Amino acid sequence: MELQTHTTPNVAAVFKEHGPYVWRVLRRLGVRESDIEDVCQEVFVVVHRRLPDFEGRSSLRTWVYGICIRTASDYRKRAVHRREVLTDEPPELVSSSDPHGELATKRARQTLDRILAALDDDKREVFVLYEIEGLGMADVCEVVGCPLQTGYSRLHAARALVQEAALLARAEGSRPS
């Protein structure tokens, strides 16, 4: 359900509708799991501050994703400035009725996160929004601020890099220890 653009929605409605997507996008854009809550809050502080200025020229979802991408980019710049290394969290103990399945899922997610972290910001943003979040390319280009052909070019390059990294990860995973 997309919120109507002729009336200004309140922040609670925006958060309810877009919060889970923002959370996932932040994670895929390189925000450490331990920092996602804070960065997500930053996104919605900006949404709250700028919501009265939302003109509806794009969908609310596209507008929120644009804020999300800029906030994640700022986060990565601050992390570099503080000389932090954005790494995966230490492995957690698995407690489930299917520990092997849960562990495999967690490893796959960690592999994807490592692959995405290796992409430059421009390619990662396009790949995440198009391939993972399912936005159309016109919306992706509006969010990241590039021409349509550039968006397709970045997507093509990102797909090639992701495929190459995934094949390498599979080959490393199948080697005997």
Regions found by a protein language model. Name each.
Residues 3, 117, 121-122, 133-150, ...:
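Helix-turn-helix DNA-binding module
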Residues 2-5, 31, 42-59, 78-80:
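Sigma70-family region 2
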Residues 82-105, 109, 136:
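Internal acidic/polar
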Residues 126-130:
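A short pre-motif secondary-structure segment
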Residues 56, 77, 119, 159-177:
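Short, Lys/Arg-enriched C-terminal cap helix and immediately downstream tail that follows
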Residues 53-55, 66-87, 105, 168-170:
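Arg/Lys-rich amphipathic alpha helix in sigma70-family domain 2
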Residues 2-24, 37, 48:
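A short, charge-rich alpha-helical start-of-domain segment used by transcription regulators
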Residues 19, 44-48, 58-78, 155, ...:
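Σ70-family region 2.3-2.4 aromatic/basic alpha-helix that recognizes the −10 promoter
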